[in-house]
């Protein structure tokens, strides 16, 4: 996702409303609906300044979730249920072996959603690159972190982003494919993108990469990106149509 304008805040300044340290919660393997309800509770409390910003670190049992731009043709062909989420984007899958991080962050005014997403991307690009994945970056028009086509594979997404802003507080967040299966993606059109692939860090690096291996580097990178210590840079290696542009929102 490329910003069509300069961000509202200088790149080296924090996008957070508070300078207090972010509180980290490690939730382990947790049901999607339970985590969603918990996010909503925390987002309300954060909007009321009752708690500091939060990072929820977790994995989900296998589940499909559909963002507000999901189309009928995106839906699974294997008969598994889908949870309709209030985040942006289209359909995706979550499951064991995928690191999920939900930042519950009160954003500084004026709220810049595009800059927030790009800072999340920057953090994930840093983490994936530091792991040794060559060329990881952006495809303009598509959010997330991508690996260029290689060894007969097409351009492939290794990390996804889907967010919601409510009362100035961000919720939902990011998912990094570590050592999860890719089988469940075969039954949907992931993120509404039919002409690209999915990958995992384990596949890219040809070794097992656990969720736990990514936790601390991801926490540091997200904290740095939101604070402006890690500055958004140009990591684009391609461009493609935005898969959500001009699509109707689910009511």
From Swiss-Prot:
Residues binding substrate, per UniProt: 87-94, 160-162, 173-175
Active-site residues, as the UniProt record annotates them: 191 (acyl-thioester intermediate)
Pfam families from the UniProt entry: LplA-B_cat
Gene designation: lipB
Keywords: Acyltransferase, Cytoplasm, Transferase
NCBIfam families, per the entry: lipB, PRK14345.1
Main location: cytoplasm
Subcellular location: Cytoplasm
Keyword Transcription regulation: no
CDD domains: LipB (cd16444)
Stated role: Catalyzes the transfer of endogenously produced octanoic acid from octanoyl-acyl-carrier-protein onto the lipoyl domains of lipoate-dependent enzymes. Lipoyl-ACP can also act as a substrate although octanoyl-ACP is likely to be the physiological substrate.
Enzyme Commission identifier(s): 2.3.1.181
Similarity section: Belongs to the LipB family.
HAMAP family to which the protein is assigned, alphabetical: LipB (MF_00013)
GO biological processes: protein modification process
Annotated pathway: Protein modification; protein lipoylation via endogenous pathway; protein N(6)-(lipoyl)lysine from octanoyl-[acyl-carrier-protein]: step 1/2
Protein name: Octanoyltransferase
Domain called BPL/LPL catalytic: residue spans: 49-230
Sites annotated Lowers pKa of active site Cys: 157
InterPro entries in alphabetical order: aa-tRNA-synth_II/BPL/LPL (IPR045864), BPL_LPL_catalytic (IPR004143), Octanoyltransferase (IPR000544), Octanoyltransferase_CS (IPR020605)
Catalytic activity entry: octanoyl-[ACP] + L-lysyl-[protein] = N(6)-octanoyl-L-lysyl-[protein] + holo-[ACP] + H(+)
GO CC terms: cytoplasm
Note: In the reaction, the free carboxyl group of octanoic acid is attached via an amide linkage to the epsilon-amino group of a specific lysine residue of lipoyl domains of lipoate-dependent enzymes.
Annotated GO MF terms: lipoyl(octanoyl) transferase activity
